Amino acid sequence: MSSDERQIAFFLDFENIALGVREKKKLRFDIDLMLQRLLEKGKILVKRAYGDWSRYKAYRQDLHTAAIELIEIPQRSYSGKNSADIRLVVDAMDLCYSKEHVDTFAIASGDSDFSPLVSKLRENAKYVIGLGVENSTSDLLVENCDEFIFYEDLIRSQKTPLKQHNIPAKKAEAFEVVISSIRALEREGKTAIWASMVKETVKRKKPSFAESHYGYSSFSKLLEEAENLKLLQLKRDERSGSYLISHLS
């Protein structure tokens, strides 16, 4: 494990996010967009979603496939709108105190009621990432988090740079996950991006990834072909012999 690899707990206030996305008439909530962005930052050790699942049956399978634990908060038990919020807060603070190795909490909600939770987590030296929907997220919540990611930005960041390169579909799949991982490292402010760092990020995003599946004897060979296709530029470190990614096309 890299020393800077975050150990993440993800908590999803599903109703808040689902309603926010529903207001964007052309959007359907895709949990994978959030999880993939978090996997660029580290390992997700805990994944929980809170809501009345009898009202959101259409989403249950996607959440189960993503290995998210569904916490049932029946609507009939609501005392106002805060029952799911209260359970999420209790679970997050319990995890904060009982699992010291979890250093990052990702809270998916736009509700200002979570601002005290964010403050308490930060008091306990936890890094807090917020995720929400534009125009339905509290400014107070955004300002309280160490980092805030809007769902619409996740959609906008989905790029398909390989269409114009006429690359076979199987190899394009490999290059796309590599390039998205390099962009993730750039977003995290990494000034030197080593091939090994890219490989670690790729494996978090796609645990089954193996360069041999795409016809390459090593990850370096895959990167070399990407350079030949002008997808990126490589620079070999003279001391270690390892590759640095110097530029993305």
State each model region's role.
Residues 137-156:
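Contiguous mid-protein beta-loop-alpha structural module that forms a pocket-lining wall or clamp
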Residues 1-4, 152-172:
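Intrinsically disordered, low-complexity linkers and terminal tails enriched in Pro/Gly
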Residues 131, 161-249:
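N-terminal regulatory modules in eukaryotic regulatory proteins
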Residues 66, 124, 143-145:
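Short, structured coil segments at secondary-structure junctions
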Residues 56-60, 133-141:
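Short, glycine/polar-rich helix-capping loops at beta-to-alpha or helix-loop-helix junctions
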Residues 1-97, 117-119, 127:
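Domain-level signal for Mg2+-assisted phosphodiester chemistry and nucleotide/NA-binding surfaces
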Residues 50-52, 103-110, 117, 121, ...:
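Acidic beta-strand-to-loop metal/phosphate-binding motif
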Residues 70, 105, 128, 148-149:
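Short, well-ordered beta-strand core segments
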